[in-house]
Swiss-Prot record:
Protein's organism: Clostridium botulinum (strain Alaska E43 / Type E3)
Source organism phylogeny: Bacteria, Bacillati, Bacillota, Clostridia, Eubacteriales
HAMAP family, per the entry: GTPase_EngB (MF_00321)
Alphabetic keyword roster: Cell cycle, Cell division, GTP-binding, Magnesium, Metal-binding, Nucleotide-binding, Septation
Name under which the protein is recorded: Probable GTP-binding protein EngB
Residue stretches making up the EngB-type G domain: 22-195
Amino acid sequence: MRIKQSEFIISAVKPHQYPIDNRNEVAFVGRSNVGKSSLINSLTNRKKLAKVSGTPGKTRLINFFLINNDFYLVDLPGYGYAKVSKSEKDTWGKTIETYLSHREELKRIVCLVDSRHKPTGDDIMMYEWAKHFGYDVVIVATKSDKLKNAEFKKSEKLIRDTLKLTKDDKFYFYSSLNKKGTEELIDKLFLEFATDID
């Protein structure tokens, strides 16, 4: 599958702002600065589709991107940034929870973790949350270009053990810098929910 067209549609906070055209949705979620915007830009081959912020925790909205005029890629607010006030964290948490608990169009959640570090308590909570709501969950370990060849197995084991993944849970490494395996990752994340396949 190729992503030939990608378009920003709307930023939303409340359910009444979500798109209402009943297209399938695949949501991306992860800690602030895990490389979520870079990953979205890399997969869509658009340098500025998702804004890459130098300030962690700046994205507070749910952003909907229409892919191939067919389905939505949904960018959820980054979590876990220490310098944000508790009330702001609570607001973001509510925004994410409302979307996850009331969205029939949502078919899969892609949880991003940093391949160089052990998943945080927030990562564990987010993964468990996604599972709790019954969604198909895929783990993508970002920034894999920073790992030496010998470190991949150790990184995967640490992430799998920390999140308590089963053998059947889907796990992939990816680097937005070298873009190795972009087409394969696109297929694994989106193919079964696309209706217009090329």
